[in-house]
Amino acid sequence: MALVLYGASSVFPVYVAVLLAILARILLTGALHEDGFADFCDGFGGGTSRERILAIMKDSHIGMYGVLGLVLYFLLLSQVLVAFTPAVAACLVWTGDVWSKCCSAQLINFLPYARKEEEAKAKVVYERMPIPAIAGVALNGLVALALLYVLTGNFLAAALAPLVVTGLMIRYLRKKIQGYTGDCCGALFLLSEFSFYLTALCMQ
């Protein structure tokens, strides 16, 4: 996404480069995180009980809350990234991706899986990461932050935002469904990443 944004900005206006970068990630990941975010919005927007929330998130059809969530997310994301120069935006996108995955990955270490294994949409139940894996993920995130500071001399404090969002999400999920699902992981990554960019914008 960062490479597409920076490369496309030399040919197209910044807002077009940002949209192409977002499209590139969607094509590369198969909209995995966005699909999870839409299901998350549908489930927690329309569900009033643990069972209902989980049932809605398991439904493959997107609802009103999912559509509204995605539209608002893409509008806000594109507007925030356009506010930076292409070089700075590319640095932030690369760092935000790595650091936000580092933070959001901790969800599986703090909460149990909310469904029974046979009910999981992808038939996969995430296991808690061993200590070496946690250390490796943390190292990747810290290296990304260090490179961001070397290249821009700014924005380190923005790293706090994904940590706060992750903590709040863990607390919210523990209260609402007593665990997490794959959709929650995807939603948390996008929300953590956006909080990083938004905080960086406030620091610019």
What residues fall within each predicted segment?
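Histidine-centered active-site/metal-ligand motif
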Residues: H33
